Amino acid sequence: MGELFRSEEMTLAQLFLQSEAAYCCVSELGELGKVQFRDLNPDVNVFQRKFVNEVRRCEEMDRKLRFVEKEIRKANIPIMDTGENPEVPFPRDMIDLEANFEKIENELKEINTNQEALKRNFLELTELKFILRKTQQFFDEMADPDLLGESSSLLEPSEMGRGTPLRLGFVAGVINRERIPTFERMLWRVCRGNVFLRQAEIENPLEDPVTGDYVHKSVFIIFFQGDQLKNRVKKICEGFRASLYPCPETPQERKEMASGVNTRIDDLQMVLNQMEDHRQRVLQAAAKNIRVWFIKVRKMKAIYHTLNLCNIDVTQKCLIAEVWCPVTDLDSIQFALRRGTEHSGSTVPSILNRMQTNQTPPTYNKTNKFTYGFQNIVDAYGIGTYREINPAPYTIITFPFLFAVMFGDFGHGILMTLFAVWMVLRESRILSQKNENEMFSTVFSGRYIILLMGVFSMYTGLIYNDCFSKSLNIFGSSWSVRPMFTYNWTEETLRGNPVLQLNPALPGVFGGPYPFGIDPIWNIATNKLTFLNSFKMKMSVILGIIHMLFGVSLSLFNHIYFKKPLNIYFGFIPEIIFMTSLFGYLVILIFYKWTAYDAHTSENAPSLLIHFINMFLFSYPESGYSMLYSGQKGIQCFLVVVALLCVPWMLLFKPLVLRRQYLRRKHLGTLNFGGIRVGNGPTEEDAEIIQHDQLSTHSEDADEPTEDEVFDFGATMVHQAIHTIEYCLGCISNTASYLRLWALSLAHAQLSEVLWTMVIHIGLSVKSLAGGLVLFFFFTAFATLTVAILLIMEGLSAFLHALRLHWVEFQNKFYSGTGFKFLPFSFEHIREGKFGE
């Protein structure tokens, strides 16, 4: 087994970095992305570590850059992305970066403050302009004598009788348009109908100086009499956030004020345009460099975070770090350290020292853009234990194949393949666009999985001879109706029977198996489902048992690699015998029945289901029960007995052997380590030798207790009993679980057929001149439903079922998945623009 089928061999290494070279060395390691730093200060608060001030400075620069980026995006200026990977700035360059970012931030804040003040002034002048314009119209309408009847309620009866001249007060302002109805009701109720409100909409929306949004507003003027009503009206206007403006009473004064307002608006507009041009120039200059600035700052921040994980020796001249790294990359790591030392100008080289440890290393599986998606499928179940068999290489084939068994349709497979090919061909452009849509990003990351699923679906679709629920007659059917008339069919037979069955036993009726896949004649046969159900059910059982046997076989390589002979003798061997004795025999029976019975003898073929049930019951009736082959009873009884013997073999032998080994070690008076004889009471020096020897030869079989460990026979028996029961029952339930291959395939085929019959078939049946137009609409509905239901919904369903078959039925035979992932210190996410990670 090469490295492709296992995780990379990892080692724990210790780094000794000179203080002046540590920054550059960590920078080079980040560019390499092959080491995972361990935190050597787990008990130290993050705010008490050595480089916390540098981290804060980087965070402050990052905050300023986020502010600039927000302003750039608000101005709809594209951020330039040349794909450049800038080098990490030296620590001394941080001051220049801080000064530059401070200057840009202050300049933008000053521009924004001035612009907001000018826009607020511009808004007030614009509102005043509309007030002067609209109020003039209101006063012109007030001169109309018909208005007197509407406003007469404002006059007291005594005043009307005296004939004194009427003098009404008024206020004018602007309010948001959606508040007008509520505003009007409030005025009416509070003032008890003693005010007169006129309002008119402002045609163009006005820009809010704070948010930048455009708001629809209306001009209003309120007439009232008396100071008490005036105070009430002003309080209501204040509550509704209406802007009140002074409005002259005479037309001449209003005209003069309007002229002055228009002049000020023109001047203000000119100043705003100049300020906006200046702001655009500043933001465009920043947009050219902001991506590079982000990468530089966040690389520096990542380096200082990593340096905070290191220890500092007592001389304050050296930083000590511990890292996990792949053994195969040690040379490149050494080269990166030398390069970092040279860049820093240090004369003292950095040292990398491999360490011996009994800690479990992280799991690191190398992937590329093709295998990445399949490895994620495996890791979603659980990160593999260090150096155990990696299921991902086998999943590359088995996953899309089992998906295709459930999804098998040549037409749907073509559509899925074309979609995947489109994503593969345009992957560079799509990656450069950095699409933030989570759903599309998930689909795009699995583009090679979708590609293989589509290709395998085309293959299984040809096997099923199913293309949009119709068969492809490529080689011509092997069945012929003509010979039936030679024997016993007549015209009366055709007229008297709506359905007739062909007899393949008659010469010439059946010409042999179809060259590839299923004969197209079955598509129009009334007993199509009977035939296909039998075929797909048996196929599901065969594929499932082969898949599970393959999983059990892979466990052997794990036991051999980890040197666990007990697991081979009392685990793998009885497991493989148990499964092959029962379910492997079932597969043999299926193939035997297919080959032993032909068209002439098929009516005498016994039921495999009945035979398999009777095999467990040891029931073999003498009458009305035909055997498949001679000696069947003896062989089946032998296989069942062997399978039953495998149960105590798995259950008892391993705990008993472990107990015997423990007792033998316990009763030994002395142990010999490398020629040094140690008695029952070892000295301190000898004890250290023992401890070091036990550490270096750490037990590769976790089930075998060492001398110092207490062996709990009861716990071991319970654990082994659970494993045995789980495996034996799992063989039955997992085999039944693979029948989902048959069920999903049947459901997909039937949905496809219903869609064809209920939609496209109706469109094709229209024979009038409008048939083409009708077919266009029916085909549109057919295409939409095909993509939505059969490709997306059914595809997702088949995907989830294939996922379950791999996680539960396949991987639980050999894959423990109890490891933890190798997370190297890398600048890759920063380079790709995934700053949050």
UniProtKB/Swiss-Prot annotation:
GO terms for biological process: vacuolar acidification. Residues 1-388, 427-441, 555-572, 659-724, 810-837 are cytoplasmic. The chain crosses the membrane at residues 389-407, 410-426, 442-471, 535-554, 573-593, 639-658, 725-749, 771-809. GO terms for molecular function: ATPase binding; proton-transporting ATPase activity, rotational mechanism. The keyword Transmembrane applies. The modification Phosphotyrosine is found at residue 364. One of its GO terms (cellular component) is melanosome. Keywords: Cytoplasmic vesicle, Hydrogen ion transport, Ion transport, Membrane, Phosphoprotein, Synapse, Transmembrane, Transmembrane helix, Transport. It is a multi-pass membrane protein. Residues 408-409, 472-534, 594-638, 750-770 are vacuolar. It is found in: Cytoplasmic vesicle, Clathrin-coated vesicle membrane; Cytoplasmic vesicle, Secretory vesicle, Synaptic vesicle membrane; Melanosome. The modification Phosphothreonine is found at residues 250, 360. It comes from the Eukaryota. The keyword Repeat does not apply. Belongs to the V-ATPase 116 kDa subunit family. V-ATPase is a heteromultimeric enzyme made up of two complexes: the ATP-hydrolytic V1 complex and the proton translocation V0 complex. The V1 complex consists of three catalytic AB heterodimers that form a heterohexamer, three peripheral stalks each consisting of EG heterodimers, one central rotor including subunits D and F, and the regulatory subunits C and H. The proton translocation complex V0 consists of the proton transport subunit a, a ring of proteolipid subunits c9c'', rotary subunit d, subunits e and f, and the accessory subunits ATP6AP1/Ac45 and ATP6AP2/PRR. Interacts with SPAAR. Subunit of the V0 complex of vacuolar(H+)-ATPase (V-ATPase), a multisubunit enzyme composed of a peripheral complex (V1) that hydrolyzes ATP and a membrane integral complex (V0) that translocates protons. V-ATPase is responsible for the acidification of various organelles, such as lysosomes, endosomes, the trans-Golgi network, and secretory granules, including synaptic vesicles. In certain cell types, can be exported to the plasma membrane, where it is involved in the acidification of the extracellular environment. Required for assembly and activity of the vacuolar ATPase. This is V-type proton ATPase 116 kDa subunit a 1. The gene is ATP6V0A1.
